[in-house]
């Protein structure tokens, strides 16, 4: 794992570079972005299950390479108020956090991520806006049923990293900015492994940015939305068919296994990774260059019915498990929204199962969600690909990798 980690982190960084940074900057009205470097420190505190700890605070340090977009009226850059795209590294000193139980600990965590920072309002030398980040983290202080039992928040060394927050920027000099920020951050195994309670923390701090070239002129205060000229955007309906898949670590199987074997045996047990699949159809109406809304129909395949039936028998008794229904296919429909920046879209779906039979323990109700990124590369259109988190009532089910085709 130590040898493959740099390759995985590099892949994440390259992925964000391809999807949202200068590689896509050749749309109408865009010009070459400005380049800057940013370094900062934050004081963070654990934000959930706080009674599990005796010490909550830790320091976080970040280093970013920033791309400051520049665009004329009619460009996506101008429509988003000249956002900053970044690739960065963060170190979270989680080893400072102390568990109440002696059988629990964290270690330092390193994250590689891509981010977008967008100003909402500018006034003189000051600006205020929001930030969003997505990437991967690595830490060797994960769950172990014998040596780290109290840390049930993540159980694999490689984790998803998600962050969001706000910033206040002061242009101190022609090429220097001071930035105060607050953020909420999340790490989890994304159901590649279990247990997977998720690690949530929040805080704030200060950073400094140095521009290697003159900063772009905004020429306005606040936000306005000019007409976007991009051949991907045509107001009206589009239709998308897609298929995807991923893997899932079964919570019910882990819980039942932990009740039937001792801790040493559980430590040597590799929880099975169950294949998951999906088929979908979206009808989306493009309201503007930045927004689209629509409806969707989905079918899902879950291969872990055998594990669910066995686990329900252990947890609830054989009689209850025999009376429950188990079917690998489920069907649902819902609403979707896409928020576009050039040929990248943030995709959000809220759905309702009208058919789902998953036994007792895995019956999380009728609602499901999908959230992630869709990429529409010009060279392979009308095909697209995406990565998203499939969830039940906002609890991760699996990471879904999809490919699809788009028609107008």
Ranges and model annotations:
Residues 39-45, 69, 89-95, 134-142, ...:
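Transmembrane beta-strands of outer-membrane beta-barrel pores
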Residues 43-62, 98-106, 249-280:
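Surface-exposed strand-loop-strand hairpins of Gram-negative outer-membrane beta-barrel proteins
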Residues 63-69, 112-118, 132-136, 162-170, ...:
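Residues on the lipid-exposed face of transmembrane beta-strands in outer-membrane beta-barrel proteins
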């Amino acid at each position: 794992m130590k040898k493959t980690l740099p390759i995985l982190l590099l892949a994440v960084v390259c992925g964000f570079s391809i999807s949202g940074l200068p590689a896509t900057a050749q749309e109408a009205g865009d010009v070459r972005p400005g380049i800057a470097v940013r370094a900062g420190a934050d004081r963070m505190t654990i934000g959930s299950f706080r009674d599990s700890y005796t010490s909550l605070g830790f320091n976080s340090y970040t280093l970013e390479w920033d791309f400051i977009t520049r665009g004329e009226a009619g460009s996506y850059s101008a429509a988003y108020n000249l956002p900053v795209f970044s690739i960065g590294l963060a170190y979270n000193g989680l080893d400072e956090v102390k568990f109440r139980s002696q059988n629990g600990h964290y270690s330092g965590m390193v994250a590689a991520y891509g981010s977008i920072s967008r100003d909402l309002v500018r006034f003189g030398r000051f600006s205020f806006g929001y930030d969003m980040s997505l990437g991967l983290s690595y830490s060797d202080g994960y769950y172990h049923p014998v040596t780290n039992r109290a840390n049930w928040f993540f159980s694999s060394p490689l984790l998803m990293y998600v962050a969001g927050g706000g910033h206040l920027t002061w242009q101190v000099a022609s090429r220097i900015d001071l930035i105060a920020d607050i953020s909420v951050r999340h790490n989890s195994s994304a159901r590649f492994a279990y247990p997977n309670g998720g690690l949530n923390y929040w805080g704030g701090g200060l950073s400094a940015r140095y521009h290697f070239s003159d900063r772009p002129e905004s020429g306005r205060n606040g936000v306005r939305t000019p007409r976007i000229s991009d051949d991907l955007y045509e107001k009206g309906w589009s239709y998308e068919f897609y298929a995807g898949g991923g893997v899932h670590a079964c919570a019910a199987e882990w819980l039942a296994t932990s009740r039937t074997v001792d801790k040493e045996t559980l430590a040597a047990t590799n929880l099975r990774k169950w294949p998951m699949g999906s088929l979908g159809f979206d009808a989306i109406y493009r309201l503007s260059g930045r927004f689209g809304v629509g409806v969707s129909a989905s079918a899902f395949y879950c291969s872990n019915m055998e594990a669910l039936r066995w686990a329900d028998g252990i947890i609830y008794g054989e009689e209850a498990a025999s009376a429950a229904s188990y079917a690998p296919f489920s069907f649902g429909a819902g609403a979707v929204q896409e928020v576009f920046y050039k040929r990248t879209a943030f995709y959000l779906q809220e759905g309702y199962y009208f058919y789902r039979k998953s036994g007792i323990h895995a019956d999380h109700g009728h609602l499901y969600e999908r959230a992630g990124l869709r990429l529409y590369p010009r060279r392979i259109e009308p095909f697209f690909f995406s990565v998203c988190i499939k969830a039940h009532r906002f609890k991760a089910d699996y990471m879904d990798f999809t490919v699809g085709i788009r028609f107008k």
